[in-house]
Amino acid sequence: MVFIESLPFTRRLHELAKTDAVEVLTAIQSDLLSNPERGRLVPGLGGIRKARASNPGRGKGKRGGFRYFYLYFESDQQIALVYLLDKDESDDLDADERKLLRALAAESQSEE
């Protein structure tokens, strides 16, 4: 499986997870390797899925941690990590974030 990180995902990962960024990324990749379709499809976002990851800095587990958004390209065995939210900040996407993710999904699918 090949993992691809969008620039918005990488920025948010380092902004939110800070010194735990590598640990969070490793946990996300491990979860997706065991089940790439684990996240639920988000309606209207072109195949983007949403799943949870824990925030080791808080020690709260997945429910109080991060929400990450990704695309799974089964035929290419690729996963594109597209965005990350902190549960304390928001449990879901605002209109601007939805617009960004639709654009990232369209761009990723056109490259496939």
What is the predicted function of each stretch?
Residues 1-62, 75-76, 90-112:
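Basic, Lys/Arg-enriched alpha-helical interface segments
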Residues 65-84:
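Short, hydrophobic/aromatic-rich beta-strand segments within well-structured domains
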Residues 87:
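Short, conserved catalytic or interaction motifs in soluble domains
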